[in-house]
Every structure is written in structure tokens, then in C-alpha cells.
């Protein structure tokens, strides 16, 4: 069964088209108009071994908020659709990932119950053209539109670029772990019988 999903979403602020293959090889085709954000999404694709096409046109003349938040909303919806009924998958994923001086923990549960928790604070307002406060908005949007419980903890770090890159890569590894099939799981991994 292919775990591929595509979604297009057009508003007055953004025009977004995303395709995600959970069982890919890490190929990214990303264009959001925000260079650092493109770099992070390419890292997510590569380190999660997801094939990701993400074409975004946003009102960057205003700022980067709508572009980044709306991309998170659509990516979360695509993740949810690609995961499907969740039968046979691990459901949980955790990664502690180093990125130079930064050490980030990401843990998630594809429970269907959205929740976002993070203790991450940045010392700079921007990395390239991306506002660092948008990192929270992006992952919050993913957690709610995908229906996942998502936690980040920054165990060490001082360079905002390294910290953000560590978050995107750790999220990719944790999501890859959570969506991995386990032959011992014959149904949905829940005492309720559904997620």
C-alpha cells in the first residue's frame, strides 16, 4: 500500500501544493520563497527519508507568517492522510539529535489528539529571512492539523540556526519511527482499538 498524499490549498494569503510519500528515499523539491525555510524542509525530507514536494507562494511582502504557518497546516493534513488508518504502525517516535552545540529531543504520538509542547527559546529574532518565532507556529500547525501530540525539548544550544535545524531533523526522525510498520502490530496500537 502506497502511503502518498497530496493537497492543494489556496487562500487570499497563500497558494500551497504539497505531496508527501512516507516511504520515499529523501527527495525534496521545495520552493517557499524563504531560503532558510526551504533548507529546513529539505532537511526534514532527507533525514526522514520522505519524498516531499512543497510549492508555496505567499504574501511575503507582508511578512513570512502566513507562508510558514499555512505550510504547517497543509503539511500536517498531508501527513495525516498519508498515515491513513494507522494499522500496523509504531505510533510513537522519539529522537535525540545533535547539531553541533545544540542537542534537541523530539517525541511524538500519532494519537489523533493534537497537543504541542516546547521549551525552545531562541537568542535571535531571525535566521536568514525567517522569523524564529515562526518555528513554534509551524510545528503547532502541524501538530493540530495532523492530530499528533508533539513535544520538543532543547537539551543544549546557543546558535539559533543549529537549534532550528536540529528540531526539523529530529522531527523527521521521530515521524519516520512513528510511521514505521511493525509486523507484531496487527491492528491499531491502542487499548481502545482506534486512534
Task: Please annotate each region the language model reported.
Residues 1-195:
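N-terminal intrinsically disordered, cationic/polar leader segments
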Amino acid at each position: 500500500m502506497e502511503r502518498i498524499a497530496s493537497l492543494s490549498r489556496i487562500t487570499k494569503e497563500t497558494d500551497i501544493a504539497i505531496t508527501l510519500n512516507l516511504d520515499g528515499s529523501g527527495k525534496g523539491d521545495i520552493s517557499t520563497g524563504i531560503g532558510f525555510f526551504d533548507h529546513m524542509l529539505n532537511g526534514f525530507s532527507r533525514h526522514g527519508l520522505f519524498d516531499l514536494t512543497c510549492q508555496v507562494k505567499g504574501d511575503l511582502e507582508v511578512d513570512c507568517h502566513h507562508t510558514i504557518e499555512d505550510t504547517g497546516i497543509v503539511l500536517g493534513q498531508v501527513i495525516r492522510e498519508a498515515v491513513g488508518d494507522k494499522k500496523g504502525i509504531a505510533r510513537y517516535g522519539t529522537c535525540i539529535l545533535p547539531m553541533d552545540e545544540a542537542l534537541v529531543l523530539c517525541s511524538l504520538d500519532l494519537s489523533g489528539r493534537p497537543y504541542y509542547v516546547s521549551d525552545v527559546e531562541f537568542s535571535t529574532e531571525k535566521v536568514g529571512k525567517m522569523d524564529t518565532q515562526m518555528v513554534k507556529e509551524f510545528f503547532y500547525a502541524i501538530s493540530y492539523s495532523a492530530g499528533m501530540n508533539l513535544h520538543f525539548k532543547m537539551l543544549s544550544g546557543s546558535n539559533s540556526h543549529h537549534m532550528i535545524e536540529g528540531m526539523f531533523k529530529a522531527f523527521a526522525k521521530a515521524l519516520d519511527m512513528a510511521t514505521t510498520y511493525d509486523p507484531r502490530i496487527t491492528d491499531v496500537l491502542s487499548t481502545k482499538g482506534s486512534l
